[in-house]
């Protein structure tokens, strides 16, 4: 068994949709990034890649590559899952935390877990998404951006 940890952060900007966990969340701003800037899925990708000792998301999907401009991070997650499988691992579970002041995410958490489960071929019972605030402290508390943390457990597929 191996554990992978991922972290990502993106700044809020006007004129972009807010996509978290593969779900469009109504908000007056979205996140800045080369892809759809889904900070949660990026943290999961990094956790998966780290657990399999395959580097990080920037190595596999660089922001200098025009193929990834505006791409759905669900596609990046699916490609990451395939890389992890080819390395001889399968995902046991995923646990995540989003850190932001607003918007409130309670109505969207279940859909995020479903999207992540679909992209990783995991049952929803093996995917956990949480959201918290920083009590108005720091960049997240000032509503300047969103941070995400992810932990994954990988099992060897016995190769």
UniProtKB/Swiss-Prot annotation:
Metabolic or biological pathway, per its Swiss-Prot or TrEMBL entry: Isoprenoid biosynthesis; isopentenyl diphosphate biosynthesis via DXP pathway; isopentenyl diphosphate from 1-deoxy-D-xylulose 5-phosphate: step 4/6
Annotated SUPFAM superfamilies: IpsF-like (SSF69765)
A molecular-function term among this protein's GO annotations: 2-C-methyl-D-erythritol 2,4-cyclodiphosphate synthase activity
Binding annotation for a divalent metal cation: 8, 10, 42
EC primary class: lyase
Disulfide bridge positions per record: none
Entry note: cofactor: Binds 1 divalent metal cation per subunit.
Reaction(s) catalysed (UniProt annotation): 4-CDP-2-C-methyl-D-erythritol 2-phosphate = 2-C-methyl-D-erythritol 2,4-cyclic diphosphate + CMP
Cofactor(s) the record lists: a divalent metal cation
InterPro entries xref list: MECDP_synthase (IPR003526), MECDP_synthase_CS (IPR020555), MECDP_synthase_sf (IPR036571)
Keyword Lyase: yes
Keywords: Isoprene biosynthesis, Lyase, Metal-binding
EC numbers for this chain: 4.6.1.12
Site entry: Transition state stabilizer: 34, 133
Database matches in Gene3D superfamilies: 2-C-methyl-D-erythritol 2,4-cyclodiphosphate synthase
Residues reported to bind 4-CDP-2-C-methyl-D-erythritol 2-phosphate: 8-10, 34-35, 56-58, 61-65, 132-135, 139, 142
Pfam families listed in its UniProt record: YgbB (PF02542)
Biological process annotations from GO: isopentenyl diphosphate biosynthetic process, methylerythritol 4-phosphate pathway; terpenoid biosynthetic process
Subunit structure, interactors included: Homotrimer.
Entry similarity comment: Belongs to the IspF family.
Function: Involved in the biosynthesis of isopentenyl diphosphate (IPP) and dimethylallyl diphosphate (DMAPP), two major building blocks of isoprenoid compounds. Catalyzes the conversion of 4-diphosphocytidyl-2-C-methyl-D-erythritol 2-phosphate (CDP-ME2P) to 2-C-methyl-D-erythritol 2,4-cyclodiphosphate (ME-CPP) with a corresponding release of cytidine 5-monophosphate (CMP).
NCBIfam families: ispF
Protein name: 2-C-methyl-D-erythritol 2,4-cyclodiphosphate synthase
Organism: Syntrophobacter fumaroxidans (strain DSM 10017 / MPOB)
